[in-house]
Regions:
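Extended, low-polarity transmembrane helix blocks
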Residues: 1-33, 74-134
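Short juxtamembrane and helix-loop transition motifs at transmembrane-helix boundaries
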Residues: 21, 36-47, 62-73
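Solvent-exposed, well-ordered loop and adjacent helix/strand elements within mature globular domains
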Residues: 26-55
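Core segments of alpha-helical transmembrane spans in multipass integral membrane proteins
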Residues: 30, 51-71, 85
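Solvent-exposed, flexible loop/coil residues
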Residues: 40, 55, 59, 127, ...
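Alpha-helix C-capping/helix-to-loop hinge sites
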Residues: 49, 68, 91-95
C-alpha cells in the first residue's frame, strides 16, 4: 500500500496538499486542545449545547486524533473523513441547537473534503488492500 497518494502529480500540488493538511491539522489541534483544557468559551459553548461537559471532552479527543491523523502518512485520508464527518455534525449543531452561523464548520468540512480528494489514491489503495484480506 502506498503512503503517498499524490506522488504522480506535480511537486507544487504535493506541497500544497501538505501545507493544507498542516493548516487544517493546526486548526483542529488548537480547537481540540482548547476543549480538553477547559477554555471558558468552550465550557460555555458546550453548556449551551446541553449534552454535558463529557461531550466537550469527547469532541476534543475526536479533534486532536483527527489532527494527528492529518499529518500521519498513511492516515491522512482517515483524518480527512473523520474530521469531515465531525464538521457535518458541527454544522447541524450550529443550525439547529445553537442557532449560530455554521460557516466556519462548513469551510473546515470542505477543506477536509479537499484533503480526502487529494489523497483519494491512498484511500483507494487501503480499500483494495482491505478487501483482499477479507
Amino acid at each position: 500500500m502506498s503512503v503517498t497518494s499524490i506522488t504522480s502529480t506535480s511537486a507544487p500540488r504535493r506541497i500544497g496538499a501538505w501545507v493544507l493538511q498542516g493548516i487544517v491539522a493546526t486548526a483542529f489541534f488548537a480547537a481540540g486542545a482548547a476543549k480538553l483544557a477547559g477554555a471558558a468559551y468552550m465550557v460555555q459553548l458546550f453548556e449551551q449545547i446541553g449534552l454535558g461537559q463529557w461531550f466537550r471532552y469527547v469532541t476534543g479527543v475526536i479533534e486532536v486524533v483527527g489532527a494527528l491523523a492529518l499529518i500521519a502518512p498513511g492516515l491522512v485520508w482517515f483524518g480527512g473523513l473523520w474530521l469531515g464527518g465531525t464538521m457535518f455534525f458541527a454544522v447541524l449543531t450550529h443550525v439547529f441547537v445553537l442557532h449560530t452561523s455554521p460557516v466556519p464548520a462548513i469551510v473546515l468540512g470542505l477543506l477536509n473534503a479537499l484533503i480526502v480528494y487529494l489523497r483519494r489514491d491512498e484511500l483507494a489503495a487501503t480499500i483494495r488492500t482491505t478487501t483482499k484480506i477479507l
